[in-house]
Amino acid sequence: MSPDYFDLNSQQHRLQLTIQGTVQGVGFRPFIYRLAMELNLTGWINNSVSGVLIEVEGLWEVLEQFKYRILQEKPPQSEIQTLDIVWLPPVGYSEFEIRVSESTNHPQKIAIILPDLSTCSDCLQDIFDPENRRYQYPFTNCTNCGPRYSIIRDLPYDRNHTTMATFTMCSDCQNEYSHPLNRRFHAQPNACPVCGPQLELWDKNGKVIASLNQALKQAADIIRSGQILALKGLGGFHLIVDARNETAVQNLRQRKRRPAKPLAVMYPNLEQVKQDCLVSELEEKLLSSPAAPIVLLRRIFNQLKSDPPHPPLLRGGEENQTFPPITKGGLGGVTSPENPYLGVMLPYTPIHHLLLAQLNFPIVATSGNFANEPICIDEAEVVTRLNTIADFFLVHNRPIVRPIDDSIVRIIANQEMVLRRARGYAPLPISLPDSIGANRPPSYQTNLSLSQSGDLSIEKPIKILALGGHLKSTIAIAFGWAEPIAFNQKAFLSQHIGDLENPLALAAFQEVINSLSNIYDFQPNIIVCDDHPDYYSTQFAENLSQQNQYPIVRVQHHLAHVFAVIAEHNLPPPLLGIAWDGTGYGLDGTIWGGEFFQVTETIIQRIASFRRFPLPGGDKAVSEPRRIALGLLYELLGNDLFNSGMNLEFMESFKPQELRIMQTMLNRKLNTPLTSSVGRLFDGVAALLGICQRVSFEGGAAMALEFAIDNLETDEYYLFAWLDTPQLPLEKGDNIGNMSYNSRYYLNWELIIKGILEDKINEKPINLISAKFH
């Protein structure tokens, strides 16, 4: 940047640096303080609503060294996105100081809030050192670790803006906080046993039965005895049982109403993880990282079976039936039934470290909620919500501002893929291209969707609130400028919220919107939502738009997937976008999910789609893949299906009366919507192969179909064909806005299904059939 002022005749110069990025809550101010002191520079630093602001005075060559070393030696958890420099006339600072954080009427707060960080090695030494004053203290932290996003109420990141504001530091903690060479220098959650939060153990009625270290010891005894403990952690409660105790795990499943979905397991250390799972170097690095996510690891099976028995639930059995035991590296099959992967994490808070040190065996640590509800964060609320699940509650008095689940990550092709973005990742911004729409016609810049209402000729700056879909919900906010739409290179993405299917989830959805909006003083002037009229997020967007006269942009579900990839990888048109999904509202009145979009400079065209097939029962077919298999075969055979005498397991799972009802529904097109969904195609194939007729969680059938491959590799595959004419006449027009949605080509899956049936009749191995299909 060109200097605003630079006196060549002066030896002393003043340099002002404005730094944006991840620079609050990572020890950045102490780092700058120590660097300035080492270089004998004077001036100051403070947190601002946009990052940090620094002014330093000294010799020109020393100031240049100061700039260079900031970039080279910055704290490990920090990230500098922008560094703006202005030269100013010196004012004669006499010392370097950390000033009180700025609280001005800045037009927009854009400072990056750091996620919660796993306990660092230095703090671990503290809590396991009998001579240390923080010995066995479960809320030990420093500038390199501990709570951040879960406790912050407002920017800038200072103690008085966090839930630690009510805990006054003792003299020892205050000395650490004030000493520039201490690693707790300006560590906002700094605390100790004298002045900080404390543990209590409650019975299921909320009565205190132990406190402090005794609470932790009794909690360990509770887990050893096979009972269920609810533990208040960083971003909410965990439900915990001994992972080796199949009776205890099954009891947790029944109480939590989670009969088959995999449960995460927390191990005391990496050595024990490696006894049960294969761990690559990259996976080990992830497990031990500051984010400390759940990592999906390949399990070690001592006894390999080519065709293992399926749990009764996957065959459509009753929920109170037990899962068959599976011999493997230590854990029973009930933690992750018929699944070659295990969701594994390591202790990431002092509470978890201290508890696991006492137990020295793996524990199930699943979200503290009923299935499909948001995680519980408040100790008063938990006694009401979870007292039918947990036998005891290990709680503390440090408030949690917002629920944050554990993140889930899987390594695919030696690259990290985040499957659930929450603790350790949120709310770090997602990088965006420098601009969206540059060098493109104005109509394309502002109409990035299929339909819109309201005036989109917004005065800059643009502030977008994007509300996501219905399942696995998240929201995002972005700041930008018109012509072209530029977003400061980032959008702030919330933590995983969950499925918007009950009042608690809807309340959590609104609270996340309010929370992010309050932190960033964010008032949107454009609302973006899914095009599905029945989604809660869409209805919320419409109400918000009407109340505040915000324009609203509705984006077709699968087109949103394509746009997300375009933005993530900064891809220029023309391009082909392929979106294969479970369910999405189609503009032709059908359910989309296997779509091919041609994206050019001026138009978006749905050029191809999977051949449609009926879903008997609509949404009910999602939980009963056997209905999908029936719809696939009916599309091919019509009523001959019911007279064919096919000896297929999925047909036998229906009672005769049920089959008659299904036939009537299909013939009369009663509650049998058409779909092009690839996700539903996978579900139907799983049922055709007898792998899975009913599921208790979304995606269960497709997972089981993938796992049936059992590491088999083959060059064989099933053929498919393309249809070059529209499958069905459409009632609506060919185009909406700048998008054509009437597909010309259809991928015909008929040969695939016929090939699968032929292989099944010829008794080919299930793993081969699944591998050929994939």
Tell where the protein language model's regions lie, with residue ranges:
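Active-site histidine-anchored catalytic micro-motif
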Residues: 566-634, 639, 643, 667, ...
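Intrinsically disordered, low-complexity, mixed-charge
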Residues: 1-189, 193, 197-200
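A contiguous, well-structured pocket-lining segment that forms one wall/lid of small-molecule binding clefts
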Residues: 189, 196-198, 469-483, 487-515, ...
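Conserved phosphate-binding catalytic cores of ATP/NTP-utilizing and phosphoryl-transfer enzymes
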Residues: 274-279, 354, 375-384, 428-436, ...
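Short glycine-rich phosphate-binding loop at a beta-alpha junction
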Residues: 230, 363, 521-534, 552-553
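A phosphate-binding glycine/aspartate-rich beta-alpha loop in the early core of alpha/beta enzymes
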Residues: 228, 236-301
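Glycine-biased, low-complexity coil/linker segments
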Residues: 314-318, 328-330, 438, 453-454, ...
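Internal gly/pro-rich beta-alpha loop/helix module
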Residues: 359-434, 670, 674-675
